[in-house]
């Protein structure tokens, strides 16, 4: 079968870094070709070359079997190559139609006036093609992330794209929205569109992809059918067989209760929530998107106000007027959006680790004890196995897994005994996930009380000693970690009455 697009021996270097080294890749018409690899494997660089953002240094690119040089994003669009970025490029104050045809709006009267009727009509044709029930005149700011993504796909198709690159398209979608996206992808496949699908999510790739190409350290490791066992694909990605963590659930029933939450309420998003976590325990929170898990975490951390309820740390009632009160009591929170909450991406590693604790190193209230700051930072980098060239490395240049570890280090320096992890591995590759899992278990072994909120049920099952399930702001069930299954958790996640028994 002739490839829509193929690359052979493609190489690309940046100052001091060889990003791509003799890469091979091809995409056929009417297939979903998944591209997998750890962060830094070269996936994004390859896609940016195909999309015209970067120019290759050497190698060959073929479009419909003919050599081609892609000189710019506009040139890529003219060649029917479209890309849907993970971070959407839409303007909230404009309508869906205006976003799709921005800069190339249909006009009449010799180009003097915008032909708004045709603009909306052309957009409606695109939406009809996708079976998308959406008015072209809807402002982007009024749409969910999932709907905005559909608009991005329609925008790419407005250039008559035959090659569509999708970068982590389900990162912010719930299960129903993922099903809708997959329906559209299958429809585009049936029309002969070739789709490059970049994702870390193994289960999704097996559902939607036809083939998988694995990259590592800037090179192509191989291309295999999507039916290939995932352990084999993971081994290709990381260059080794990942150790399957053997789940051991310790008996923490006699341990001190570090965190106790009673009668927590906030409107309809948190409704009479009760739970406790003991020293050395990992408590998982499962539920569908919008169930209230993050809202509970933010309330316990003092980030959002509550209507009623109490929070106790080591038996002592604490007043939560702000996150500072929670931190002072020994509660640390790792947000699901670490780049906006929790990590100062423009600052270096050392500053991120020590900034909240600087008062500890003030001499006479005036001078910072810089050697002590450097020592504790170096200690944390070693303890958490943070991969960074130096303490002065800017945090945004670290991989997702190492950024997460820097945030953990910050709370450990603060001596927090209760650590709340909200989506701890979101956007993190499979090798780094394994490191984060190992770290969470080590922290529990050291006597920390850990709360893990995750939308990935296999992750909840792998980590949790106990699992609480939420639906519509209530806790609808508690399941012991050694008997929990995806089926039992999903049943509880769709159950609307609250848990009758007291949660211990």
From Swiss-Prot:
Family annotation (PROSITE patterns): ABC_TRANSPORTER_1, ABC_TRANSPORTER_2, MGLA, RBSA
Residues reported to bind ATP: 37-44
Keywords: ATP-binding, Cell inner membrane, Cell membrane, Membrane, Nucleotide-binding, Repeat, Sugar transport, Translocase, Transport
EC number: 7.5.2.11, 7.5.2.7
Subcellular location: Cell inner membrane
GO molecular function, one term: ATP hydrolysis activity
Domain ABC transporter residue range list: 5-242, 252-497
Enzyme type, top EC level: translocase
Major site of localization recorded for this protein: membrane
Membrane topology label: Peripheral membrane protein
Reactions accelerated catalytically: D-ribose(out) + ATP + H2O = D-ribose(in) + ADP + phosphate + H(+); D-galactose(out) + ATP + H2O = D-galactose(in) + ADP + phosphate + H(+)
GO cellular component terms, A-Z: plasma membrane
Function: Part of an ABC transporter complex involved in carbohydrate import. Could be involved in ribose, galactose and/or methyl galactoside import. Responsible for energy coupling to the transport system.
Annotated family: Belongs to the ABC transporter superfamily. Carbohydrate importer 2 (CUT2) (TC 3.A.1.2) family.
Protein name: Putative ribose/galactose/methyl galactoside import ATP-binding protein
Species name: Albidiferax ferrireducens (strain ATCC BAA-621 / DSM 15236 / T118)
């Amino acid at each position: 079968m002739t490839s829509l697009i193929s690359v052979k021996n493609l190489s690309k270097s940046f100052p001091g870094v060889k990003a791509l080294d003799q890469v091979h890749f091809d995409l056929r018409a009417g297939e979903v070709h998944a591209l997998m690899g750890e962060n830094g494997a070269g996936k994004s660089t390859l896609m940016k070359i195909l999309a015209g953002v970067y120019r290759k240094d050497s190698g060959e690119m073929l479009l419909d079997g003919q050599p081609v040089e892609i000189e710019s994003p506009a040139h890529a669009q003219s060649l029917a190559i479209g890309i849907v970025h993970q971070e959407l490029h839409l303007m909230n104050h404009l309508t869906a139609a205006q976003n799709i045809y921005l800069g190339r709006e249909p006009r009449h009267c010799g180009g003097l006036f915008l032909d708004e009727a045709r603009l909306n009509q052309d957009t409606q044709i695109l939406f009809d093609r996708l079976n998308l029930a959406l008015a072209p005149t809807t402002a982007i700011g009024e749409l969910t992330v999932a709907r905005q993504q559909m608009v991005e796909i329609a925008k790419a198709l407005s250039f008559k794209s035959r090659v569509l690159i999708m970068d982590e398209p389900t990162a912010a979608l719930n299960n129903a929205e993922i099903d809708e996206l997959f329906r559209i992808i299958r429809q585009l496949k049936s029309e002969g569109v070739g789709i490059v699908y970049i994702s870390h999510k193994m289960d999704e790739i097996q559902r939607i992809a036809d083939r998988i190409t694995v990259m590592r350290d800037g090179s192509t490791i191989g291309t295999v059918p999507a039916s290939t066992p995932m352990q084999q694909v993971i081994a290709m990605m990381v260059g080794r067989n990942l150790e399957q963590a053997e789940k051991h659930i310790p008996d923490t029933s006699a341990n001190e209760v570090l965190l106790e939450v009673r009668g927590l309420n906030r409107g309809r998003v948190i409704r009479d929530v009760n739970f406790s976590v003991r020293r050395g325990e990992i408590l998982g929170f499962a539920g569908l998107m919008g169930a209230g898990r993050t809202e509970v975490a933010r309330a316990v951390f003092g980030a959002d106000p509550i209507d009623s309820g109490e929070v106790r740390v080591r038996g002592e009632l604490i007043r939560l007027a702000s996150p500072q009160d929670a931190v002072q009591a020994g509660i640390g929170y790792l947000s699901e959006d670490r780049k906006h909450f929790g990590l100062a991406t423009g600052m270096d590693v050392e500053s991120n680790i020590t900034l909240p604790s600087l008062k500890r190193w003030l001499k006479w209230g005036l001078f910072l004890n810089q050697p002590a700051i450097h020592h504790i930072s170096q200690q944390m980098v070693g303890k958490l196995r943070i991969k960074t060239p130096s303490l002065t490395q800017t945090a945004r240049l670290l991989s997702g897994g190492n950024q997460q570890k820097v945030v953990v280090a910050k709370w450990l320096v603060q001596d927090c005994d209760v650590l709340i992890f909200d989506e701890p591995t979101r956007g993190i590759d499979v090798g780094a996930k394994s490191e984060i899992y190992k770290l969470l278990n080590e922290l529990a072994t050291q006597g920390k009380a850990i709360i893990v909120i995750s939308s990935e049920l296999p992750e909840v099952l792998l980590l949790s000693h106990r699992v609480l399930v939420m639906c519509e702001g209530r806790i609808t069930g508690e399941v012991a970690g050694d008997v929990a299954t995806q089926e039992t958790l999903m049943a509880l996640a769709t159950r609307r009455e609250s848990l009758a028994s007291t949660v211990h």
